[in-house]
Amino acid sequence: MIRTESGALGGHDEENRNLTPRILVKLSGIALLLSGILATVGFFIHPHDSAPSNRGIWLGAHILVIGGGLLNLLGLVGLYLVSAAQLGLTGLSGFLLAAVSLVLYLGKLYWSAFIYPLVMARDAAFIRSYGFTPGSEPVDPTVRIVFYLGPILFAIGYALLGLSLLRVRAYPAPALWALIAGVLLVGLWPLLPGAVQSLGVVVSVIYTTGIVWIGYLLAKARDVVA
């Protein structure tokens, strides 16, 4: 459980000179907060049609989302460790699933950002034949499983962690429910009906609200109780 303060994010001068647990928790909170912002900005500027014709924007958007994913992974560690002793097996399972999902997703983003545009420019037929174009579904069963596994684990993992935090009242319920709703919508996005997928702005706002809110509260932690 954490208790928050209404003052600035910085602590005492002596504490700020050392990487105390409190400072590390604050950094985790800031990482989560920034992860939501970077991922959302990256999503909004991402060209969803063709990489070669929008190479600069395509690369910039992916770098933002990759940065958001890395910060999310770092912040996730602090988010879990602060309340680890109270969360039990469900919380641990959620943390591990969410961490694995982010690693899988970062691998997919690396391919999409740096390798896909080069292959698409040289052999577009190869990309289309395997269903690797934006909005397409991979043809190969193994690739399809990996493609869907990342976002599904993200939804399940973060939802389990969020519900565990809700059970021990680690954060205000509205913030946790916003986080849970956001990760479920983002994680299960590939499986949702087209009508829901068209509400990308709404989904992004819900997710960003939840992850930024929780990150802000974690960054303002006054006392850390494991």
What are these regions (language model features)?
Residues 2-226:
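Hydrophobic, aromatic-enriched alpha-helical segments typical of multi-pass transmembrane helices
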